[in-house]
């Protein structure tokens, strides 16, 4: 382990609200893993943890998140993940190897076809014990497979046991990540609230991150309207890809004051 990523402030204060904008025609599901429907922004990022966490300042490297340690032989014929004892879903249930296998199985059979293709080189998934799971590889030429498996979002098998995976709609699901859905207006806005007792808050790959108490997204159908809303101070961050806008649109008190 390590104390924290070099690019974060481990003592960063927590609080406040981050207001964001999405330019799209709304959303109709909280399930980003299936082909049907349009998922709300932020679900993957804030609601679900993965086995490993990528580093933002290294080329395709990752460190354990739900997985405490990872084993793979020289020939990369398999990868074994040992899960952290403290890993929990947001309802307090422990994250186990059963949940990891369920996630792999449901994503590759009922999820978006992307997952079936992405994990096509996995030949077998073996639960060794409650906290240990091994993925066997049929093709060992892809040296990145252990890292690819590390990107697997882990879903709660107990939550989905009596639910149809493709029919979640707008029922806020149980996740394992640093935020949960606290409020939404169908197709128009969604608010995430920080989980104060988030299980991974003191783990190196998470320390100093996810500091806002709330993250709020408003939806705009038109980018021009979104830009005017930003100019009016209605949200806090915008990615600009238009040279014309960059040169001419960001003027006025909100910008000249340096705030």
Q: Positions of the model-derived regions?
A:
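Gly/Pro-rich hinge or "lid" segments in bacterial periplasmic/extracellular proteins
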Residues: 48-58, 149-216, 221-225
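Aromatic- and charge-enriched surface segment that lines or borders ligand/interaction sites
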Residues: 8-13, 33-42, 69-113, 128, ...
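Extracytoplasmic
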Residues: 13-17, 46, 65-67, 74-78, ...
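N-terminal lobe/hinge region of extracytoplasmic solute-binding protein
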Residues: 1-75, 82, 105, 174
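Short, well-ordered beta-strand elements
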Residues: 15-24, 68, 78-81, 100-103, ...
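Extracellular/periplasmic solute-recognition and catalytic clefts
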Residues: 124-126, 182-193, 218-259
């Amino acid at each position: 382990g390590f104390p924290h990523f070099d690019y974060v402030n481990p003592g960063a204060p927590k609080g406040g609200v981050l207001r964001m904008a999405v330019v799209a025609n709304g959303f109709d599901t909280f399930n980003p893993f299936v082909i049907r429907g349009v998922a709300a922004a932020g679900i993957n990022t804030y609601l679900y943890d993965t086995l490993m966490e990528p580093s933002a300042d290294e080329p395709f490297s990752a460190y354990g998140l739900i997985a405490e340690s990872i084993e793979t032989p020289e020939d990369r014929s398999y990868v074994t993940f040992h899960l952290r004892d403290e890993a929990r879903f947001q309802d307090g249930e422990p994250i186990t190897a059963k949940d990891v296998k369920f996630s792999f199985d449901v994503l590759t059979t009922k999820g978006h076809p992307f997952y079936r293709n992405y994990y096509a080189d996995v030949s077998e998934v073996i639960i060794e014990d409650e906290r240990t799971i091994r993925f066997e590889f049929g093709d060992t030429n892809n040296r990145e497979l252990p890292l690819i498996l590390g990107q697997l979002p882990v879903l709660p098998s107990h939550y989905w046991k009596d639910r149809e995976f493709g029919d979640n709609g707008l029922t806020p699901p149980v996740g394992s990540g640093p935020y949960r859905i606290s409020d939404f207006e169908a197709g128009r806005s969604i608010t995430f609230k920080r989980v104060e007792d988030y299980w991974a808050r003191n783990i190196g790959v998470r320390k100093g991150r996810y500091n806002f108490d709330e993250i709020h997204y408003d939806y705009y159908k038109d980018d021009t309207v979104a830009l005017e809303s930003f100019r009016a101070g209605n949200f806090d961050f915008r990615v600009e890809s238009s040279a014309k806008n960059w040169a001419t649109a960001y003027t006025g008190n909100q910008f000249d004051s340096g705030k």
